[in-house]
Amino acid sequence: MARASLVQPALWALLLLQVVGPAAAAKLNIPKVLLPFTRATRVNFTLEASEGCYRWSSTRPEVASIEPLGSSEQQCSQKAVVQARLTQPARLTSIIFAEDITTGQVLRCDAIVDLIHGIQIVSTTRELYLEDSPLELKIQALDSEGNTFSTLAGLVFDWTIVKDTEANGFSDSHNALRILTFLESTYIPPSYISEMEKAAKQGDTILVSGMKTGSSKLKARIQEAVYKNVRPAEVRLLILENILLNPAYDVYLLVGTSIHYKVQKIRQGKITELSMPSDQYELQLQNSIPDPQGDPARPVAILTQDTSRVTAMQMGQSNLVLGHRSIRMQGASRLPNSTIYVVEAGYLGFTVYPGDRWVLETGHLYAITIEVFDRSSNKVYPSDNIRIEAVLPAEFFEVLSSSQNGSYHHIRAIQSGQTAISATLTSVVDQDGGVHVLQVPVWNQQEVDIHIPITLYPSILTFPWQPKTGAYQYTIKAHGGSGNFSWSSSSSMVATVTVKGVMTTSGDTGLSVIRAHDVQNPLHFGEMKVYVIEPSSMEFAPCQVEARVGHTLELPLTISGFMPGGGSEVVTLSDCSHFDLVVEVENQGVFQPLPGRLPPGPEHCSGVKVKADAQGSTTLLVSYTHGHVHLDAKITLAAYLPLKAVDPSSVAVVTLGSSKEMLFEGGPRPWVLEPSKFFRNVTSEDTGSISLSLLGPPASRNYQQHRVLMTCQALGEQVIALSVGNRPSLSNPFPAVEPTVVKSICAPPSRLTLMPVYALPQLDLSCPLLQQNKQVVPVSSHRNPLLDLGAYDQQGRRFDNFSSLSIQWESSRPLLASIELDQPMQLVSQDDGNGQKKLHGLQTVSVHEASGTTAISATATGYQQSHLSEARVKQPHDPLVPVSASIELILVEDVRVSPEEMTIYNHPGVQVELYITEGSGYFFLNTSTQDIIKVAYQDTRGVALVHPLLPGSSTVMVHDLCLAFPAPAKAIIHVSDIQELYVRVVDKVEIGKAVKAYVRVLDFYKKPFLAKYFTFMDLKLQAASQIITLVTLDEALDNYTATFLVHGVAIGQTSLSASVTDKSGQRVSSTPQQIEVFPPFRLIPRKVTLIIGAMMQITSEGGPQPQSNILFSINNESVAAVSSSGLVRGLMVGNGSVLGVVQAVDAETGKVIIVSQDLVEVEVLQLQAVRIRAPITRMRTGTQMPVFVTGITSNQSPFSFGNAVPGLTFHWSVTKRDVLDLRGRHHEVSIRLPPQYNFAMNVYGRVKGRTGLRVVVKALDPTAGQLHGLGKELSDEIQIQVFEKLRLLNPEIEAEQILMSPNSFIKLQTNRDGAAILSYRVLDGPEKAPIVHTDEKGFLVSGSGIGVSTLEVIAQEPFGTNQTILVAVKVSPVSYLRISMSPVLHTQHKEALTALPLGMTVTFIVHFHDSSGDIFHAHNSVLNFATNRDDFVQIGKGATNNTCIIRTVSVGLTLLHVWDVEHLGLSDFVPLPVLQAITPELSGAVVVGDILCLASVLTSLGGVSGTWSSSASHVLYVDPKTGVAIARDAGSVTVYYEIAGQLKTFKEIVVGTPQKIVARRLHSAQTSIQEATASKVTVSVGDRSSNLLGECSPAQREAIEALHPESLISCQLQFKQDVFDFPACDVFTVEPGFDAALGQYLCSVTMRRLTDKQLKHLNMKKTSLAVTASIPSSYTSVEKVGAEVPFSPGLYANQAEILLSNHYTSSEVKVFGAVESLENLEVKSGSPAVLAFVKEKSFGLPSFITYTVGVLDPTAGSQGPLSTALTFSSPATNQAITIPVTVAFVLDRRGPGPYGASLLSHFLDSYQVMFFTFFALLAGTAVTIIAYHTVCAPRELASPLALTPRASPQHSPHYLASSPAAFNTLPSGRKASPPSGLWSPAYASH
């Protein structure tokens, strides 16, 4: 409590926030610290936070301080030292806070300072062994409560070794124990211990070690004086020798085996063996426990003391104990012991070293150990006297050595493979050499896998350094081992390796050793080295640099670098395939570099691949740049075309003496660097039979050709060989050489052939006539055939050249065909299609257009000698045996095929016929494609049958085999699968009627298939539902369409889809076509009865949904007119019918079709009489009923005449006013309808009696013919009896009843529902059938009968009282219904409205009454509501059956009819007139700039006006409170007037752009000169004279002023003529305004203060001011009409003042001004001595009057200077100007008289006169100033129109007030109203 009271409350609040806050991630190392109280030393404790940087503080620094650890520059630290600071011995606490400077998190630790009450020494053991590690002893301090202090750091202790009085015979010596310092040990102490040891002090922790065996006692006490009474702490330690027993573990022996034990001790870090038996120690066997089956009398084992050997005698166990021989030591220390188990051998085990894995490697040495285990898997000690026989296969192992007992073998693995080693424990040999064979030998074997050593390939890899990790990967191959390896890298910064041996380079250079360890034996591994170095050079390795076009060249790269370590050894990189090599080709298009790089190879590390694209040569440059390393290499490449024999391709045949020019193409080109190495060789077998010669160099650079001319000199065959290439060179070490061979044959012709030249030589077909009639060929009789002569040798090979032959031609019938001499045979070499040219002899045969047969023959008679001589043919040669050929020609017409184009369906069963006519009759038919169609020709019929195979287009070509020249006759066949189906059907069908659906199947070209294919397609038309039925019709619209009849059987919507089966059996369906089966389209009403001028709207029911537009028409347009919306208006008496048609558009044809139609009869009549429709004629007082006017028939309802134009008026009256009240139908909501709407009224029964109800119907325009006989009025009257309601007078109570209609129900409710237990019961006699029924919940249900029942309601109160009421329940039929409306409308002055407000939503409630007028509480009527038109109101169902909601949407009259569906006699009619509730009525268009004072009489119940709003404030802004609206922009807007929670009405306003803006000068009577300085111009925006619309209230006028409508316009000024050098705005100012009284905008123009220069200029020239106004600049097309404002700048004088004297008695002054001002200019003088008279008048331009000013009395001024003024004023313009006049009297020195000398000479000669004149001028000026301030200043006007022009202070003498008051104002009688304009006050020049 004491320390808590010291903490500030604010701090506690902070702590509380931090403690209860969310846990932070940072933590302190300790929550509480207990520190000892000290005086001499300070005990520290380090606090440390896990993370963050903190500001540390202590709540009580005097108890415990806190010091942060770290740099002094930082304001925070993560560690801090807590130090006990308490000066008085007490237990106190300080709270340590650490606040994170970043997050604000606060950590807390409590630091407690207390006294030490006791200490104790803590150790890990109390026994020390000689030469063992030292023991650490630590002091632990406790307070009075036994709490342990957190630290004793820094507290000084005294550690001493004292005498041990309890040694019990042990040697007690200070030398037995030694206290060590940490400085001389190998252990790290706490930092404060090191500091204390340096100061030769001992802390709370020390080290001790044993010096010799014995016992020692250690004592520690606190050195601090405060704790002198604290009891020291003591500890006794025992120091022993370190004795070991070998083996020290438990031993398992077999019977008969033995083990030798050794006793050892550790001395100076070495283990030495003690000779046993010893003086100090002895071995003993104790606790011998034989096996249960053993002999208890025999020992389990015996110990031979001399040899320390234990021999197992029988199965069991025994303990071997090492003990002290000295009795005093036997209980003081614990010596080692061992347990010996004698067991039976269970099985053998095998181990191998190294690795302990039975996976070995050949060539390695291994130690195999065979171990014996008992049945419990305990390892048996392998005694030397056991015998184990091991079998190690000699082909796998080389045994180097073995142990005597056979348990150890040193071997070498010599062969790989799988084998097994086995071992058998057979016997035990005793000490005497006796062999004891085991009855059951123990045998086992071990499988061994031996592998060859692991080697990695390659052994060295060298990679270039790349900046990114993983640039190179290489899969290292490992051989040997088990095949399953684990991989490792010695330096992962250089290279890494994956589990699959994939090496990846890292980011550093250097060496990494990759090892692959055998997973089955990790000791086996193979390794290789990976170097990562920087490259230093790059070059291409020798390779092939020539390639055929299309082939690829691989260009290997060799990149070298220096080995790591700084040496000069260069090594070739193993892999540089990931180098970012830049490959550049000098000549683009020859070689194309291929993506990717060559994989590394033995002689290269990477490389590029290029593809030969075109023949030519280029240079390839490969470069690499990274950082400071830049390498490049260049190589020249060449591409060539393959060498091939073109002509001939293989064999050339010529006749003797003929030659053949052989053409070869391609082959290597001359090497670009050494062209001289290029060669071409051509050889033959026998150079004497043929001559060969190369024709010129290669033809061109781009297309290399080799031509060899071969000439036949002797008959025979030869092989010609050509080889092309380059010889090896330095830049082309592996050149390409291309060889090729052809055969040459020189032979005589064995036969000749004659063939017609056909237009299609690709058809290798012969005419059948040629085979049947031997060389009979039909040809066209209209074209000359061309015959081709060919020569063949004995092998049937055609001659390449037979030009050395001599040929003779003949014709058998020259009249049909002849050989003309002027058309000799042309020898032409033509390509035979294989590139080889053959000689053709082309001979033209002339035909003469006659049919018949002729024979043409050609004969080779011998050789031409000229050819033989030129070819140097060897002589003699064999003569030629003549050969000949003939051909018979038949002249015929050309072939034709029909049809030429058609489309067929792809189906196996489809076939079409092509008709072939004319021609030779021998035809070959083929197609342009092989897989589209199959064509079969029936020659007997001349018909080709076409079968489809696959979709597509193909051309059938009919070749006439026996006509040589004509092109084939063609027919284009399109084979198509089904692309889509198209269903055309009207989407609407009336139930019970039918429409036709048309289906077409389209091919791929969107063309329809023929209908004959539909049978192959299984065409079906299906409907998605059963609302329609489908019938297939046989009639066909065309050859492509299937027709179906769609019959509507049920109402709904479905879809039609056609489907067919294609060739593959898949169904193909069309897009579903929606079709609607709609109910019969019916127009309502079925008959329309109207009078002339009345209107009724025809509506519809049924028909398609959503309903399309209905087209209305009438058959007799003179009787009535019908609008597009179905509104029928009566025109004249008569009958007609209105047809309503529902149309739809045919999707395919686009034609409009009629879906459904209906007729309505229309009767236009005259009202012959009227009747009052009253549901009852007897009514009870206090009830009401509706009455309305009808015609004489039931069809003549108010719908027939209620809205006629011109209208009818209805006037109601009663004969006795006190019996009935007549009220309008909407009287309850304060609407009083005018007479023209009062066709229906409400009748209220007031008092009992009988009265007549009369109505008079008057025609507003009798000539309209609405009443029979052009009558003016009709009337009717009925009698109504009002009777009094039955009441009880004694007692005077109200007897009420529940009124229900038959078959209705009501839920009864009482005021005790939920509070009392209610029960309901109908009290009727047992003989009377109940009229109503009720249940326990209060549901009252009436039956079909009528009558009265009694209902008992009992309430059982919880306090024990019962309440009972009896209620009569009357069941009666409904007699009539009545409509009422809500809500009630309130107006400002309680006046009634004449119509419903536009935009209002009202609720109509239907009330049901019985025959007495009482209202039913429950009924079962189903009501219908209808209006005579739907464009003025919107009607909708209400929340209950007897309500409807109507919203008024447009101005006009609508009639509402409500009736009971089951009882048509229950009906009512009410008028619904709708008018605007917002005024004013806007006759014309509203334009931008108009201001509207909107108003509405509607208010809330309390008389509060509503709020105004606009749908678009940027178009029309409306003040929400007053309703003032300003049109700002063109557009349509809706203004809303809303009374919150009651109603909302609106008015639609269209704001247009004004066509013109007119400014007019405002003529006003100005009464003062000051007002003449301003002028106002009215601005009319638009065509109206006023821009203020509506009647504005005072509040609205204030709102207009606050809204500043003048901001909408801007006013502009300019001079009408540009006659001044300054603009009008420098002289005048103009401001826009708005005058609410005028309702117009204004431009107020004011003249500024003018400078003398401006005043002078304005007077010198005359013009007027043009004022225009404009609205925002977006309306650029607005016409602007300006106003012309005349202005007068004011009077101007050419002198500022006048000086007169007795010498100069007169002076002239010119006064300038407007003509209006100068015409009646008056002048007045302030002194009689000074006069002014007109000298000259000039009313030209400029206008001025010259005045002569003189002194009347020459002696004036003799008594002193006379100062006065002349005032020039104009009554017409109220302008005036004042000129000061000074008269001085000057004496003449030279003469006695005053008139002797001139004024000037006296002035110049008299010094006094100069001073006099100066002071006179000063006096005059002073008088003027005083007069100004005295007279003018108080008279300044403040009217806004009197904006006086400003002037600078030096012009002040020229203001109006500068003249005396007497001249300042004209007499009122003389003041004339100046013309409206701008007038300046008086100005004068200086």
From Swiss-Prot:
Keyword ATP-binding: no
Membrane topology: Single-pass type I membrane protein
GO BP terms in the entry: mRNA transport; nucleocytoplasmic transport; protein transport; protein-containing complex assembly
Residue numbers carrying Phosphothreonine: T1844
Signal peptide span: 1-26
SMART domains with a match to the protein in the record: BID_2 (SM00635)
The keyword Signal is annotated on this UniProt entry: yes
Keywords in alphabetical order: Endoplasmic reticulum, Glycoprotein, Membrane, mRNA transport, Nuclear pore complex, Nucleus, Phosphoprotein, Protein transport, Signal, Translocation, Transmembrane, Transmembrane helix, Transport
Chain ranges on the Cytoplasmic side, renumbered to this chain: 1830-1886
Post-translational modification: N-glycosylated, but not all potential glycosylation sites may be used. Contains high-mannose type oligosaccharides.
Entry's transmembrane regions: 1809-1829
Annotated Gene Ontology cellular component terms: endoplasmic reticulum membrane; nuclear envelope; nuclear membrane; nuclear pore
Function: Nucleoporin essential for nuclear pore assembly and fusion, nuclear pore spacing, as well as structural integrity.
Subunit (UniProt): Forms dimers and possibly higher-order oligomers.
Protein name per Swiss-Prot or TrEMBL: Nuclear pore membrane glycoprotein 210
Organism encoding this protein: Mus musculus
